[in-house]
Amino acid sequence: MIKLKDLIKEEVSMSQLNQVEKYLDKIWAKVGIDVEFTRHFHDRVNDERNKKPINTAELIRIYREIYKKYGKQISQLSNGVELLLKDMSTDINVPVVLKWDGKEFDMIAKTVMRKKNFKSRTKKYSV
């Protein structure tokens, strides 16, 4: 017997995450940044510790709003810099690292979590 809570639980598939990544690449390409999601990021998007599941619209929103507010500033940072993308309205936190691949920066999302009062020593970019 299928339980209602199992039907409501909406996991983000790897295919959906790839589509989100392609969409965000088009936005961030304007400042020379390629968005990358790791396997761990995918696993953590669907982690039950998030309480409320993280959905694709929330991921798009945080990256799009961070781009609008800080895109040019982030594109001027140096290779290897770690930073935290933070959405205050959804409590979503995305620690990322910038890596130069020879032609553009890769913004590699190491993980993602929904957590109030997330602590990090890296520079925070909040929306």
Indicate residue ranges for each PLM-predicted region:
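Ribonuclease/tRNase effector modules and their secretory precursors
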Residues: I2-V127
